[in-house]
């Protein structure tokens, strides 16, 4: 990216932020019936027409995680109290897919998902204003969330989770996925040294974990066993039309694929199935 492109990108971001804080700035209500999923972009909600159609039954090896978040979401959709959720742990184990499956499960019961990246979190007051008082139930979905020190959006999200953000709406929950349990990078230097004349150095460390503590429900994901990986690969093979099951040849190929990738995640299993089925055409 040349300097002009960098300048234009930064200018566009600045204008977007200015529009959200100007006194006369307005955000138009979207057509909530046009889609079940929306994406917050450039200060507006855009419908996502082709949201991934995945069912809860398609997700293997995470039965406990499925039940915990399904129960929380069920309570919320039915008008009961429920918690904000942090899904954290190993990559490719179904964290994002689980949120998508929940939408497909409950979209017919007025559940809506709004996907937002961490740069857009500073616009949370605008989103709260859009959904407040509406009959639908909304999940604000932050995928692959993590923060660096003093990064934009951190304090806004923290205030929202505390319920301090413009009377945070009772028809809106936050579901976030992250590979980090505490959402912020931990450094050895935080534990081995103090900075300057700081009297209470451990308070800085506690601040780093304080954001994740504000999620009422923590759901952890772990690497899959070999048997779980093969079961997921078999499910994906069936999805792509393979009808010969997990025979010895396919099993060896699936294990070799995972070995070459250094992972037995569900994502890797899906990638293997695509490759294998594509080769059979």
Question: Where do the language-model regions lie?
Answer:
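Phosphate-binding P-loop
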Residues: 48-50, 74-82
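Pre-Walker A adenine-sensing motif
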Residues: 64-78
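Conserved AAA+ ATPase "SRH/arginine-finger" region at the nucleotide-binding site
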Residues: 114, 178, 188, 195-209, ...
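Walker A/P-loop nucleotide-binding motif
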Residues: 79-101
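AAA+/P-loop NTPase substrate/partner-engagement loops
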Residues: 105-138, 144-150
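Dynamic helix-loop-helix/coil hinge segments at AAA+ ATPase domain boundaries and subdomain interfaces
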Residues: 2, 44-68
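Conserved catalytic/switch belt of AAA+ P-loop NTPases
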Residues: 149-197
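C-terminal alpha-helical "lid" subdomain
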Residues: 2-27, 222-281
């Amino acid at each position: 990216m040349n300097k002009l492109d960098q300048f234009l990108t930064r200018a566009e971001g600045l204008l977007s932020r200015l529009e959200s804080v100007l006194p006369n700035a307005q955000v138009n209500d979207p057509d909530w019936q046009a889609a079940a999923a929306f994406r917050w972009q450039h200060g507006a909600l855009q419908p996502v027409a082709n949201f991934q159609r995945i069912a809860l039954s398609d997700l293997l090896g995470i039965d406990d995680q499925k039940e915990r978040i399904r129960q929380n979401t069920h309570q919320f959709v039915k008008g009961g109290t429920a918690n904000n959720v942090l899904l954290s742990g190993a990559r490719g184990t179904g964290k994002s897919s689980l949120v998508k499956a929940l939408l497909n499960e409950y979209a017919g019961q007025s559940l809506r998902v709004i996907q937002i990246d961490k740069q857009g979190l500073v616009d949370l007051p605008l989103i709260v204003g859009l959904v407040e008082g509406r009959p639908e139930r909304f999940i604000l979905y932050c995928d692959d969330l993590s923060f660096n020190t003093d990064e934009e959006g951190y304090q806004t999200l923290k205030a929202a989770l505390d319920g301090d953000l413009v009377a945070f709406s009772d028809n809106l929950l936050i579901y976030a996925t992250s590979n980090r349990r505490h959402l912020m990078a931990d450094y050895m230097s935080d534990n081995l040294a103090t900075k300057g004349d700081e009297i209470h150095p451990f308070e800085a460390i506690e601040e780093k974990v304080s954001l994740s503590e504000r999620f009422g429900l923590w759901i952890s994901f772990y690497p899959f066993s070999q048997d779980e990986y093969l079961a997921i690969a078999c499910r994906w093979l069936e999805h792509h039309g393979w009808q010969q099951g997990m025979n010895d040849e396919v099993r060896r190929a699936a294990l070799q694929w995972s070995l070459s990738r250094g992972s037995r995640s569900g994502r890797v299993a899906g990638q293997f199935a695509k490759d294998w089925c594509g080769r059979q055409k």
